[in-house]
């Protein structure tokens, strides 16, 4: 269970806004393939949102919401689409899927990535409440979500950079898949508090004992966020500010009350 901290509450609301902006892309799509891809992702996001809010995926209602978004006029401005979205979610009894704020920034995207990372960690740590196969399937879907974040980035330079470095996140999701697969065939996962990949290549024990960092994806998303913030000064050809600070793992764990 993820502790309900102010930061995690912000992440959840950003996730709802991210989901809204994703279905906004549906009405502008002119490609059948893209529409199908966006619909699949939006359906997953809203199923999960409903699971959080209603303890049920609300399959029919989410399907109606997605179909409505697909058929909405591409000429409608975002403000009008927001008004009609509020009306539609109210009509479908999906009010809890309405974001508290519609102010969309880069923070919205970062919060959503951190949120999904925490969800992955929670699914892995509580895997005994479902099944390994179920968690493995969720991880495959999560990889697609992270892979396609560039769809919603409204900065060309940011999109290009994300396309180059997103493999860092996906690589770590696949490390979790490998650990789960080992457990499936008899080698239980041992959770440790430190990041293991630096020594995994040289330490046979790390590999053979199937060790996995607890809260790995939270750590990875924090590290990735720090890297992007570091690299933007190179992209802008500017000197970093004198008092520029990076998030530390200790501070991040405190903000999220992670054990």
Swiss-Prot record:
GO molecular function, one term: thiol oxidase activity
A Pfam family of this chain: Baculo_p33
Keyword Hydrolase assigned: no
Keyword Aminoacyl-tRNA synthetase: no
Gene Ontology cellular-component annotations: host cell cytoplasm; host cell nucleus
Keywords assigned: Early protein, Host cytoplasm, Host nucleus, Oxidoreductase
Reaction(s) this enzyme catalyzes, per UniProt: 2 R'C(R)SH + O2 = R'C(R)S-S(R)CR' + H2O2
E.C. designation(s): 1.8.3.2
Subcellular location: Host cytoplasm; Host nucleus
InterPro entries associated with the record: Baculo_p33
Family: Belongs to the baculoviridae p33 family.
UniProt subunit comment: Homodimer.
Function: Functional FAD-linked sulfhydryl oxidase that is required for infectious budded virion (BV) production and for the formation of enveloped occluded virion (ODV).
Protein name: FAD-linked sulfhydryl oxidase
Organism: Autographa californica nuclear polyhedrosis virus (AcMNPV)
């Amino acid at each position: 269970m993820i502790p309900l901290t102010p930061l995690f509450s912000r992440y959840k609301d950003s996730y709802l806004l991210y989901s809204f902006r994703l279905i906004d892309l549906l009405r502008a799509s002119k490609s059948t393939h893209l529409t199908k891809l966006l619909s699949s992702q939006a359906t997953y996001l809203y199923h999960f949102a409903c699971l959080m809010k209603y303890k049920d995926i609300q399959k029919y209602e989410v399907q109606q919401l997605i179909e409505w978004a697909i058929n909405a006029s591409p000429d409608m401005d975002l403000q009008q689409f927001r008004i009609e979205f509020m009306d539609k979610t109210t009509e479908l009894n999906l009010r809890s899927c309405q974001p508290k704020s519609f102010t969309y920034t880069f923070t919205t995207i970062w919060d959503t990535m951190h949120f999904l990372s925490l969800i992955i960690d929670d699914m892995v740590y509580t895997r005994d409440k479902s099944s390994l196969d179920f968690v493995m399937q969720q991880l495959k879907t999560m990889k697609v979500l992270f892979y396609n974040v560039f769809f919603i980035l409204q900065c060309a330079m940011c999109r290009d950079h994300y396309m180059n470095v997103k493999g860092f996140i996906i690589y770590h999701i696949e490390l979790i898949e490998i650990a789960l697969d080992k457990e499936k065939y008899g080698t239980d996962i041992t959770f440790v508090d430190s990041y293991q990949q630096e020594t995994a290549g040289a330490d046979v024990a790390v590999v053979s004992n199937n060790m996995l960092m607890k809260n790995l994806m939270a750590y990875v998303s924090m590290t990735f966020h720090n890297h992007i913030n570091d690299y933007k000064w190179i992209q802008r050809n500017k000197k970093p500010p004198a008092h520029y600070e990076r998030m530390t793992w200790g501070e991040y764990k405190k903000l999220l009350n992670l054990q």
